[in-house]
Amino acid sequence: MKPPDNSFTDDRLLGGRVHIRQPASGYRVAIDPVLLAAAVPAKAGQQILDAGCGTGAALFCLAARVPGLNLTGLERQALLAEYAQAGVALNGLAASARIVTGDLAQRATGPFDIVMTNPPFADSGTPPPDGSRAGAHMESDIDLRGWIGHCLAVLKPKGRLVLIHRAERLSDILSALADRAGDIHIRPIYGKAGQPARRVIVDAGKDRRTPDTLLPGLVLHADDGAFTPAADAILRAGQALL
């Protein structure tokens, strides 16, 4: 009998509704892709791209909330793309989702109604020793401005870009969107009430000029460390964050 493959684990999100396959060590899914998926204003029939999809967690969470989407995941790391492709089968999405292995600058095609993305978040410092984590966490040949530019380029006119990133990069995000997008909705994500925001979710409309909106923030944890009811509704029940 063939021994079990211990290089990956099969796990669940959204209270068991979503299956993901991911490396047993190195890059592991956190809550960012789940929050990202909850913030995507998708409708059945739309074309959706997840740029840098990793193992597909955000795509699969979005599909669980909004049936009938046409989903594309783009991932440059072949191993993560392989796990994402396995996730397509595990979630019964073979007819509506595809995973493309390649670089955002070279392999992204469109046009898409919505591009969702959780870009590499660190622009400097020492990369993690694990290759999959380094690729997911560190900007490489495409910096944040370039990443956003490529995402906007494959959007339909008036299409929307939705991204999650570290709160301290908000000024860089808004600078990259300037003169190329508007109707920008900014939602801070707080670890606990009274703390500085840890993440921001930014939803921008390509070629729009509507003024920006600062939305109410989401607090993830109560003082005792448990998820707040609002966070629990998203992370376990799969509710939208719109």
Identify what each model region corresponds to.
Residues K2-A42:
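Class I SAM-dependent transferase core
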Residues L36, N118, W147, A204:
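Residue-level signal for inorganic ion chemistry
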Residues H19, N70, S96-R98, G182-H185:
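Conserved beta-strand segments of alpha/beta enzyme cores
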Residues P196-L242:
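SAM/dcSAM-binding transferase cores
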Residues P119-G146, H150-A153:
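Mobile active-site "lid"/loop adjacent to the S-adenosyl-L-methionine
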Residues A39-T117, D123-P129:
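Conserved SAM/SAH cofactor-binding pocket of Class I
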Residues S25, I142-G191, Q195-A197:
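Conserved Class I SAM-dependent methyltransferase catalytic core
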